[in-house]
Regions:
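Residue-level recognition of tetratricopeptide repeat
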Residues: 74-75, 107-109, 142, 146, ...
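Single-residue signature of alpha-solenoid repeat helices
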Residues: 61, 95, 128, 166, ...
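N-terminal leader/linker segments that initiate helical-solenoid repeat arrays
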Residues: 19-79, 97
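TPR-repeat structural position
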Residues: 57-58, 92, 124-125, 163, ...
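Terminal, low-structured helical/coil segments at or just beyond the last alpha-helical repeat
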Residues: 25-29, 232-273
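Alpha-helical adaptor scaffolds
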Residues: 116-121, 149-211
């Protein structure tokens, strides 16, 4: 009986010990919380995980983050950092579990990022549209990885063969960018051109490819698909051959889609070397 009493007291003490930090957190100010969480991020991301090459030492990388999560599992950035390398090594289902946690704890910051990962990495185009649509409704047409949420919606429609929806989405996004920034991103013009090409609207497709080439003059994909549109319209063989050859040469020289994440994934309609 005495032993049971001692064990019971020890268990109660352990439970209470674990409760005190949570009570303290409930009383902390927003500023104190930020300071505490920033310290955890510094220790377990910048001073630990970031110093490890996850391509070789994934367990050690994840251990750094897990130690931080044990201190505070509500820090969304720790969950995002756990997810990110799994997407980059194409273990999308593993990464998704952690990225969902990041969205749960900070939807405004990570929902559009999840939509981006679904579109470019996991190829979950319907899921990408859902995430980006929800983000736009709640927070506006935010930029994620240099592009608007609408851009990824248009790209997802393109990959789902819903070309008319893709065309309209890119068109609206281009007009909004011109209104706000005086110009649109060359990839919006390029993919707008692709959506038109897929619908055999060849003259309009060429016009959009030309807009992309105005910004990025050696853009091999724009040249390549422009040559296809010209062939469909019956342009001269010499003109088509010149443009096609120039596109192939520029692709060999590396004048392709310039997105940072193109080192991990082939982008839609990107030419292979």
């Amino acid at each position: 009986m005495k032993i049971k009493f001692i064990i019971s007291n020890i268990a109660t003490l352990l439970l209470c010990t674990n409760c005190f930090p949570q009570e303290n957190r409930n009383n902390e100010t927003a500023e104190d919380k930020k300071v505490r969480q920033d310290k955890i991020i510094q220790e377990h991301v910048y001073d630990c995980a970031d110093k490890i090459n996850y391509n070789f030492w994934m367990k050690q990388y994840q251990d750094c983050l897990d130690a931080g999560i044990k201190k505070d599992s509500t820090i969304a950035y720790l969950w995002q950092q756990k997810a990110m390398p799994y997407y980059k090594v194409r273990k999308y289902s593993v990464g998704k579990e952690y990225l969902d946690k990041a969205v749960f704890y900070n939807e405004k910051r990570w929902l559009s990022y999840r939509g981006f990962m679904k579109c470019i990495f996991a190829k979950d185009y319907k899921g990408a549209i859902e995430d980006m649509d929800l983000y736009i409704k709640k927070y506006g047409n935010h930029y994620e990885m240099d592009h608007t949420c609408a851009f990824y919606i248009g790209l997802s429609y393109l990959q789902l063969n819903e070309f008319s929806k893709a065309e309209k989405t890119f068109e609206t996004d281009i007009n909004e960018q011109i209104k706000q920034r005086k110009e649109a991103h060359f990839l919006d013009w390029f993919y707008h051109g692709i959506s038109l090409l897929e619908q055999q609207k060849f003259e309009r497709a060429i016009a959009s490819f030309d807009e992309a080439l105005t910004v990025y003059t050696n853009f091999s994909e724009a040249q390549y698909y422009k040559s296809i549109a010209k062939a469909a319209l019956g342009h001269s063989e010499d003109e088509i051959q010149f443009l096609f050859t120039e596109a192939i040469e520029n692709r060999k020289k590396g004048y392709t889609i310039t997105e940072d994440n193109a080192v991990y994934e082939i982008y839609p309609y990107q030419l292979r070397k």
